[in-house]
Design a protein with these regions (language model features):
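A short beta-strand element within the Helicase C-terminal
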Residues: 224-249, 255-258, 273-277
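Conserved segment of the helicase C-terminal RecA-like domain
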Residues: 253-258, 262-292
């Protein structure tokens, strides 16, 4: 007979379908789970499986007893509860059905080539601490004024234009440290002729969808850039993005790759994606080459080698380039 597919979400309740696509938030409610016998599904597939350590996912996983469980994630080394020594692999009994890392995916031509430019950002007081002391409110305000100053706005715009993009017009993402900064920068960019919008987690699904439509489509009120803090780090798929600008310190190789990855989907009329990373004087800078190389050994010599000759180590048409001051900053962080 015919096979029926359906959804279980806040709005859809197709509980009797053969193949059900569900959001964890909805399915994990007890009254929804209990509509199903525990052995109802032969197979359960969990997307964004690095969240499987979260309570809502656990509740669903503990309830069902399928013959087969599969988890899919781009970041298996990341987990929600951040407890050292516990990991996602354990949850899936250390069975890895298939694994592909950035380097290999580039070699296999699964991703769009990227041109990465690590360039000098203006110096600011390091993000949270000065000489081991927390920043005063005054210093934080000064940082904020500085990060959103006309001078820096002009500098960012010049660099973005200089490094360019592939395609008829820019369809860009800009990652900022804080939502206030994203909102303020967006205002200033708009004053200078860019068409931008700042999005945050508090924006509705609809607002986000509308923004993406405007970014991607050429026949409606177009957007050049969406500014955000981390809303685009996972689960959002916009293959058309042809420029990614990083205006924030790198927190971890994982987050860095997730943000870079926003530009790596292939799309028509997009030959490559340009990544412009503004490298300030941050102590985490050494994570950038680690992320780009996929080298998890954290070996200092490898990190240095990668900064100096990244191009020869990255497969395909992609390129990596650090300006001199950025190289210095990374060497200092190592």
């Amino acid at each position: 007979g015919s096979i029926k597919t359906g959804m279980v979400t806040g709005k859809s309740h197709d509980y009797d379908a053969d193949f059900i696509f569900a959001t964890v938030q909805t399915l994990s409610k007890t009254e929804n789970l209990e509509r199903f016998p525990r052995d109802y599904f032969e197979c359960c597939i969990y997307d964004e499986a690095h969240h499987t350590s979260a309570d809502s996912y656990k509740k669903v996983m503990d309830y069902f007893t399928p013959k087969f469980t599969l988890g899919m994630t781009a970041t298996p080394d990341k987990r929600d509860d951040h407890i050292e020594g516990r990991n996602i692999y354990e949850i899936f009994d250390h069975n890895i059905a298939y694994e592909i890392r950035l380097q290999k995916a580039m070699e296999e031509d699964l991703l769009c080539p990227f041109h990465y430019f690590g360039i000098t950002d203006f110096e600011i007081i390091d993000d949270e601490m000065v000489n081991g002391k927390k920043l005063t409110t005054e210093q934080k305000l000064e940082n904020f004024r500085f990060l959103t100053s006309d001078e820096r706005v002009k500098y960012v715009m010049e660099q973005a234009q200089y490094y360019g993009y592939s395609g008829d017009r820019v369809k860009g993402l800009i990652f900022c440290s804080r939502i206030e900064e994203a909102q303020e920068l967006s205002k200033k960019f708009n004053k200078h002729g860019w068409r931008t919008l700042a999005l945050s987690g508090s924006d509705s699904e609809e607002v986000r969808r509308d923004a993406i439509e405007r970014l991607v489509n050429d026949d409606i009120n177009e957007l050049d850039y969406i500014l955000s803090v981390d809303i685009f780090s996972e689960g959002v798929d916009v293959p058309e993005i042809n420029q990614v600008i990083m205006l924030r310190p790198t927190q971890s190789p994982i987050v860095f790759i997730q943000q870079l990855g926003r530009g790596l989907r292939k799309a028509e009329d997009k030959e490559y994606v340009v990544i412009v990373d503004f490298i300030g004087n941050y102590k985490n800078n050494f994570m950038i080459p680690i992320a780009l190389s996929g080298d998890r050994s954290y070996n200092k010599d490898n990190v240095r080698k990668y900064v100096v000759s990244g191009n020869s180590l990255i497969p395909g048409a992609s390129t990596i380039h650090f300006d001199e001051i950025s190289k210095e900053r990374i060497f200092n962080a190592v």
